[in-house]
Curated annotation (Swiss-Prot):
GO terms for cellular component: mitochondrial inner membrane
Keyword Membrane attached: yes
Main location: mitochondrion
One biological process term in Gene Ontology: positive regulation of mitochondrial translation
Protein name: Mitochondrial translation factor ATP22
GO molecular function: translation regulator activity
Subcellular location: Mitochondrion inner membrane
Transit peptide location: 1-56
Protein encoded by which gene: ATP22
Stated family: Belongs to the ATP22 family.
Length: 684
């Protein structure tokens, strides 16, 4: 029998708890969380929505789950039933305060539940859920004000025993139970899993799923502030900015500011910690201004931040806090690159190459990423390769390039794999063009390889005849596939993502003009054993590249794509759903088109794609809640709105967005470069 809190009460138990709680504790069945709609079948089933006044109904916090009794398994032992009963009576005595004693009792009960034998995993999960639910109901003020901390071993058990398909429901349970989200790495893993999942899962992990109804915003943001730490909220907002998901960004930035002001800074390091947090907040603000294209405010914020870093004395504490300079300078370099100001970018890098910042590997990787990406403007893959070999471990990187077939096409203009002695001899003739301070030392990374593939294929599409270019594409693809199967596991930091695959599919579809070949390559790639470990790290889905306006595909082939996506856990994206809507509209299948549009509505995707907006208007379909109606005005005023051209559609992440280059004048550039120089002098 579990120990009870050492406190004596004379009144009956029923008078000491609320009626709903007493009824719940006395019921015969346990409770579980079930979704109203099976989200995992989103790709194969229609998702009907109630429509009102040409708007889809907003989803409320309570719409996502309901509590229903679950019958016990007939095979449960009497011992397990006894334990269930004991735990269901857990600490039913309401204490007047909630402190160390109550938390110790709560923890003890959770740990006792973990150690129960002869109990199925599902029953144990229900036990843990019951304990947490009871705690939440017994101490509503604690839940409302500060939330509940769970021991790390409980989160660990959840991670290893809750099926991946139940992650959505589990996370929703944690939110409703006011469980602090970032007190365990295992809880963070659930967050990351959801962020990489379906649109609904991403919106749950970022709380956006509850924000479509404006009446929820205040309550939900209070929960965000309570359950998140400052650092975890920074990570969440940065993720939204990276995806250019700006729907609720101002609300989240306000929450960050509140979190910044709430923290109590004390002790001898109090001032330093306060300044460090301010810089972290400012870096997130800079990132948002960069991604949203607000160049004028970015320049002002950047200059003020560097001045503050110097004046506050934070440069004296740079070790262990190198991010305070890494991120603002990286954002500025990124702005120079996307503005096609290569000369200014090279000038800043020349200032940085002898600075103390070069001792930080992450900063050097940032630097090389921007430098190599800037070379795309020159269409010179050999130049990209020279810098790659000068920065990363030349021997290991050359071996990777040789195995991938890149070395052969780059330096021999044909498909060939060199022997080790021949490769070593050729590598010896490649001069190092970077100072030692900029050397990273580890093998080349996947993002840098992605840039090299883009540069090589861009150049080859011009220099090679059509048939030769197609052979080049297929040779590089098959060697890449072979490398992932046989070689990639040898490299510790290798990360299987879809970046390189997207490059292949883009050039096969839009440069070689082989849409059916792109379909076959995609299916071939996802038929490989390594495919299940490939992570979607970008907003661009390879299935969208193949499906969008690909009129060579039959209905059966599109269905096969969906099956492959489901089998490999590839979530539906807005781009894929939009592609399917357009496909069915072209086929004059209104029912099929509406079915896919319902998925867009149910997923809570933001709609800004003008061609899709035209379809919605023509079909008389409802627009989503919080739809930006100025886009309708723009549609009326501009009768010549067209879909993006196929040749440029998939060259970057912004499949359905105008690619406007941010512009700023020479005076702004000079001011920013000069303040970087002054900051580096202070660092020295």
């Amino acid at each position: 029998m579990l120990k009870c809190i050492c406190r004596v009460y004379s009144q009956p138990l029923a008078q000491m708890v609320t009626s709903p709680l007493f009824k719940h504790m006395g019921s015969a069945g346990t409770y579980t969380i079930l979704p109203i709609t099976n989200l995992r079948h989103l790709s194969t089933k229609n998702c009907p929505l109630k429509i009102k006044s040409n708007r889809s109904e907003p989803l409320q916090f309570g719409d996502f789950e309901r509590q229903v009794p679950c019958s016990r398994k007939s095979g449960s032992s009497k011992n397990v039933q006894k334990r269930l009963y004991e735990l269901r009576q857990l600490k039913t005595v309401l204490s007047e305060t909630f402190g160390v004693t109550e938390y110790a009792s709560f923890f003890e009960s959770l740990r006792n539940a973990l150690h129960i034998n002869n109990c199925s995993e599902n029953e144990k999960k229900k036990l843990l859920y019951d304990i947490i639910l009871h705690q939440h109901e017994l101490y509503p003020e604690v839940a409302r004000k500060i939330g509940f901390y769970l021991p790390g071993e409980v989160h660990r058990w959840f991670w290893y025993h809750i099926p991946k398909s139940e992650s959505f429901n589990h996370y929703l349970f944690l939110l409703k139970s006011d469980v602090l989200l970032f007190t365990s790495n295992y809880c963070t893993r659930f967050t990351n899993r959801l962020i990489k999942g379906t649109e609904m899962e991403r919106q749950l992990a970022t709380f956006q799923i509850f924000l479509h109804d404006e009446t929820n915003i205040k309550f939900i943001m209070e929960k965000v502030l309570k359950l998140h730490t400052f650092d975890s909220l920074i990570a969440l907002v940065n993720g939204l900015v990276k995806a250019k998901n700006f729907r609720f960004i101002k609300v989240f930035i306000q929450a960050l500011l509140q979190k910044l002001e709430q923290h109590c800074y004390s002790g001898k390091d109090g001032a330093k910690q306060k300044n460090l947090r301010y810089v972290k907040f400012n870096n997130t603000l800079l990132y948002y201004l960069l991604k949203s294209g607000n160049v004028e405010l970015f320049i002002k914020t950047f200059q003020e931040e560097l001045k503050f870093i110097v004046s506050s004395g934070l440069l004296n504490h740079i070790d262990g806090n190198e991010h305070i300079l890494n991120f603002p300078i990286h954002h500025y370099l990124n702005l120079l690159r996307i503005s096609n100001r290569q000369e200014e970018l090279f000038n800043v890098i020349s200032c940085l190459q002898s600075s103390p910042l070069m001792k930080y590997k992450l900063f050097k990787e940032f630097l090389m990423g921007e430098l190599i990406a800037s070379f795309q403007a020159f269409r010179d893959p050999k130049l990209v390769c020279k810098y790659l070999l000068s920065s990363y471990s030349s021997k290991a990187s050359a071996n990777i390039l040789n195995a991938l077939g890149i070395w052969g096409w780059l330096y021999h203009s044909k498909s060939t794999t060199l022997t080790a002695p021949t490769l070593a001899r050729e590598l010896k003739n490649k001069n190092n063009i970077l100072p030692n301070t900029m050397r990273i030392g580890s093998p080349v990374t996947v993002p840098i390889l992605t840039e090299l593939y883009r540069s090589l294929l861009s150049s080859s599409s011009v220099s090679l005849e059509s048939g030769q270019f197609k052979n080049c594409l297929l040779d590089l693809y098959y060697k890449y596939k072979s490398f992932l199967s046989e070689e990639a596991h040898k490299y510790r930091y290798w990360r299987n993502d879809t970046g390189i695959l997207n490059v292949f599919l883009n050039y096969i579809r839009f440069q070689a003009r082989e849409p059916r070949l792109a379909y076959n390559v995609l299916l071939d790639f996802y038929s490989q054993p390594f495919a299940k470990k490939v992570v979607l790290t970008t907003t661009l889905c390879p299935f969208s590249i193949v499906a969008y306006k690909n009129h060579t595909l039959t209905q059966a082939e599109l269905s096969e794509l969906l099956q492959v996506m489901h089998k490999n856990g590839v979530p539906l994206t807005f781009k894929f759903c939009s592609a399917m809507v357009m496909h069915y509209v072209k086929m004059r299948d209104e029912k099929g088109a509406r079915s896919w549009y319902n998925k867009i509505l149910f997923g809570g995707f933001e709609i800004r794609h003008m061609a899709l907006i035209q379809i919605i208007k023509d079909q008389g379909w409802p627009f989503p809640k919080n739809f930006d109606e100025t886009l309708l005005t723009e549609l009326v005023e501009n009768n010549n709105i067209k879909e993006p051209t196929d040749s440029t559609l998939f060259t970057d992440e912004d499949m359905f967005e105008e690619d406007g280059k941010p512009r700023f004048n020479d005076d702004d550039v000079n001011k920013c470069t000069n303040i970087i120089r002054e900051t580096l002098k202070s660092l020295n």
